[in-house]
């Protein structure tokens, strides 16, 4: 059975959870008997994938048009495969077009939904209408849709009522607990000048990740606690400036706020996570949140917003704490987040207990081999 995975992100250009998912899923699928996987990605040639550059004439076009043009180039090369599996709206249209051209079954993995991310218009401009159209077209025509959480499955059916519920299945993301494991390399902390007790945020600078909410919440957190921000790649200048201004405001009065703008190498990332007593995930939209699983793999307690699929990962009171989010009352969310940080950081013994329980939960319930096996079952089903 030949499977073609289509993705925008592929090493070395992996910047989000969807990219991590594709890399780990590909590795695990290749360990499944009888499965042959190739990868078609954006960003130019790769040694281990078919990489596509933006077609000539579209180099200066809106990002959404660039994606559609690249998708058509990819679709042209998907004639000789058994199943096409696309990830994110950037790649969905390639699978949609190839399905029309060749009749090849197309499966979509729902990592996020354009109708639930209106702030993407800040990044794409009018291209947001194109991305929304491309996603809608692909979802409604897909042979199957993989939702990365039950929450995401409900969102798919709500956003796209024309989709047959029988086509939408939940297969949650996984985490490699061998790669994300406790790493007590203090030299990494020394490199960044980090000392003392601290909490950590890891993620892109986008409205979705709620970093601005966290920074406003941190203003009222005791200065005894440090904050590490592994945060870069702003979606657009507006959110980039807002976050930078908030960070500089904190750093003006505190010496224990560290901003790591570049993507840290894996070894450094696990050391930064392990050194933290609390992982912070203030997302306002999160279909599952692989980053929480990565923190749990490193035995770090998680404080997260109770949105999307996060409650399916973070067991409230067992591996961390959840804070309700209401888009109409951001001040309450920030205040509640402040209080939760203060409460948890004042209980180091509890944090250690939550962290150890988190690794156990990640290991027992979120292994990639199980994800791959379930995915292969779906491939087989759409081929019948």
Language model regions located:
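Conserved donor-binding/catalytic core segment of Leloir-type glycosyltransferases
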Residues: 4, 193-220, 228-230
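Short His-centered aromatic/hydrophobic patch
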Residues: 86-91, 110
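Carbohydrate-associated surface elements
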Residues: 151, 174
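Nucleotide-activated donor-binding/catalytic signature segment of Leloir-type glycosyltransferases, i.e.
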Residues: 196, 240-263, 267
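Short alpha-helical donor nucleotide-sugar binding micro-motif in glycosyltransferases
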Residues: 271-276
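Short hydrophobic beta-strand element within catalytic cores of glycosyltransferases
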Residues: 278, 301-304, 314
């Amino acid at each position: 059975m030949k499977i073609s995975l289509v993705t925008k992100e592929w090493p070395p250009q992996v910047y989000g959870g969807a990219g991590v998912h594709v890399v780990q899923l590909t590795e695990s699928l290749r360990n499944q008997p009888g499965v042959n996987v190739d990868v078609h990605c954006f960003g130019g040639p790769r040694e281990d994938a078919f990489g596509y550059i933006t077609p000539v004439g579209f180099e200066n076009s809106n990002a959404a048009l660039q994606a559609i043009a690249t998708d058509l180039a990819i679709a042209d090369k998907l004639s000789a495969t058994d199943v096409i599996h696309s990830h994110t709206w950037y790649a969905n249209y390639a699978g949609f077009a190839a399905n029309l051209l060749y009749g090849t079954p197309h499966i979509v993995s729902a990592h996020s939904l354009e109708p639930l991310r209106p702030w993407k218009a800040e990044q794409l401009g009018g291209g947001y209408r194109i991305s929304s159209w491309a996603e809608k077209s692909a979802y409604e025509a897909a042979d199957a849709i993989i939702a990365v959480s039950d929450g995401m499955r409900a969102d798919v059916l709500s956003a796209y009522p024309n989709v047959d519920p029988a086509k939408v299945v939940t297969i949650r993301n996984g985490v490699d607990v061998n790669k994300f494991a406790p790493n007590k390399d203090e030299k990494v902390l020394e490199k960044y000048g980090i000392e003392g007790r601290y909490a950590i945020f890891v993620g892109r600078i986008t409205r979705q990740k709620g970093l601005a909410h966290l920074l406003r919440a941190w203003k009222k957190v005791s200065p005894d606690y440090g904050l590490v921000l592994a945060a870069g790649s702003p979606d657009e200048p507006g959110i980039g400036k807002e976050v930078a201004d908030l960070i500089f405001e904190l750093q003006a009065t505190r010496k224990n706020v560290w901003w790591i703008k570049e993507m840290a190498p894996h070894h450094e990332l696990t050391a930064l996570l392990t050194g933290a007593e609390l992982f912070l995930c203030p997302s306002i939209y999160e279909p599952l949140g692989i980053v929480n699983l990565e923190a749990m793999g490193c035995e770090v307690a998680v404080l997260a917003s109770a949105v999307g699929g996060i409650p399916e990962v973070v067991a409230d009171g067992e591996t961390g704490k959840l804070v309700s989010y209401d888009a109409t009352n951001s001040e309450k969310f920030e205040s509640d987040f402040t209080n939760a940080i203060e409460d948890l950081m004042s209980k180091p013994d509890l944090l250690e207990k939550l962290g150890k329980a988190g690794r156990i939960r990640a290991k027992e319930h979120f292994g990639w081999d199980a994800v791959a096996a379930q995915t292969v079952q779906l491939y087989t089903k759409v081929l019948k």
